[in-house]
Amino acid sequence: MRALRDSPICLEGIEAIDEGRRAAPPWEAVRPEVVREARAARSGSVGGSGPLGLAQRNLLSFGRQMAGHPAAVVGGVVILLYVMAAAFAPWVVPCAPDEVALSQRLTAPSWTGAFPLGTDQLGRDILSRIIFGARVSILVGILTIAISVTVGVGLGVVAGYFRGPFDRLVSRFTDLLLAFPYLIFVIGAMAVMGPGFWNLIWALSFKGWVEFYRLARAEVMSEKTREYVEAARALGRSNAAIICGEILPNVVHSILVLGTLRMGNMIVLESSLSFLGLGIPPRTPAWGSMVNDGRRYMLTAWWVATLPGLALVVLVLAINLVGEALRDVLDPRLKEG
Amino acid sequence: MATGMGTQTVLQVSGLSTIYPTPRGNVEAVRGVDLALDEGDVLAIVGESGCGKSACLLSIMRLVPHPGRVIAGSVMFQGRDLMKLGARDMREVRGRDIAMVFQDPMTTLNPAFRVGDQIAESLRVHGLLPGFPASLARRSRAREREMVTELMRQVGIPSPETRHLEYPHQFSGGMQQRILIAIALACKPRVLLADEPTTALDVTIQAQVLELMREINETTGTAIVLVTHDLAIAAEFCREVAVMYAGQIVEQGPIDAVLEDPVHPYTRGLLRSIPRLGERKPLTPIMGEVPDLAALGPGCSFAPRCEARRPCCDISQPELVAVDGRRLVRCHARRD
């Protein structure tokens, strides 16, 4: 809670809230004059009740609710650490990730030594390789989910809203894709295309969009029967405006939740493929291939395989914790009044 | 029609017919409905559930849900036949010229947006407020808030300056319906189609909402078509009433005449089945069931339930004819 409140993004709005809280605790009921005063106090910022002001307040309410889930805050901090480390990898690592020091091979972890997390069978620093491996995992997670969401939601919204032959065609195609086990499918695709970063992204996304398609399609179909859609039509809004302006805002929360949870899956899949030697090419450090490297030394040098695996577990756990909290906060059925 | 006010006709519906194809055959939801609405008219359409009241309104707006469709008839509005308009022109008419208020305010408002934004949206759709991105300008935001709070004030929502920032679930049912009426009135429509606007509300709130609609009708001259199954509301609110049965209008005329001296046996039956305060007589329901609209016979569709049934009723459809100069009745057994 404190950590979030002190972050610079939320500070502006917090003032307004704290001003208002003296009068009325639920911030939705903040008296407008109080908010206006608070707003006027921060000169140069947006005034009035326009879209920007609303977006700020919405974000704030969302932040406050997320802060109510301690596990999610921990998860968020962990994810932030991983992302920072990955983004600034060349500057934060103690050694180059591919610097070989055969004389130092299989050094045990020690806080005082040159290699805090030890070295592998070629004497490469494991900490540096884990940090560089985070780049691969995070990028794969973000890119595959971005592609899957774009394709899946785009097709799903159109299919769910207009139905008809397009829906039948795409839905049958997704049924076909779902008939393949995911891992086998991706292994097959990678075996054909060969290892490589972009090949991996395409192989994972090729099936990843199906779930988003089904979710978006089902949500749109159920939202479409709601009266507000009919009312929007009676108001003279076009189909495109109804999809983007009326239905999507009611659907976006479930897509966000699924996207977060699936990102963990994608990262695990990437590691599985790298473990099998089908994912990222061997020169690039990736957690999966590091675990595979250390497999043979499990009994003599446990750290080579265990630590990259631990890095993977912690990241995926953090992502899932945040995903769970998002579901609690964003599900309108659980939302407080 | 029979208002005698000599004002001009705003909406002229003739021969409107709508079907819903089903595996059992075509359900004829609306069968040749004729209506004429003058400026400032208040017309009630009453009837049982499933008699085609709502389908009739949706047909006028060309919003009949797929796979239903209007198969015949015309709706003349400002010299144009709405049934022949292109999709884009029809969207222009919806909301701007003819607005609609729905039954359940809770589900008709979009839960994801603040009510002020939803009212503003209705102004934006028809260009009364600038759309995105011009809507972000400080001046247009101020103007937007001014127009929205003014509309909310008009429909009697207290402290609109605060409440336009609230979400639909923070309002009571009556207030939600007022917001919907504000949305419908935003573009100052010529005709307001109200589909059971008070059914989801409790009785005192019903009266307030009806009073609000009456006020709007009197001050702006907006013609109102009120669909309801409640004859008391029709009697209270409307000058003219059309009774629908099985997709057809069976009796239409000034409200006093129809309620005090109903001619059609169905109207008589409806009136007898309303409980009255202080009377301890048992109610007389209309026996039998609503006919299957997918399998209508050649005769009068009310004949199987009719107390005044004659042999000819099973053979031929009665026409809607004028009776005692003031109203129209569709019955073989009418008095002439």
Predicted ranges, named:
Chain B
Residues 8-9, 158-162, 252-336:
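Short catalytic/signature loops enriched in Gly
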Residues 70-81:
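Conserved ABC transporter NBD signature motif
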Residues 186-190:
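A short, proline-enriched helix->beta-strand linker immediately N-terminal to the Walker B motif
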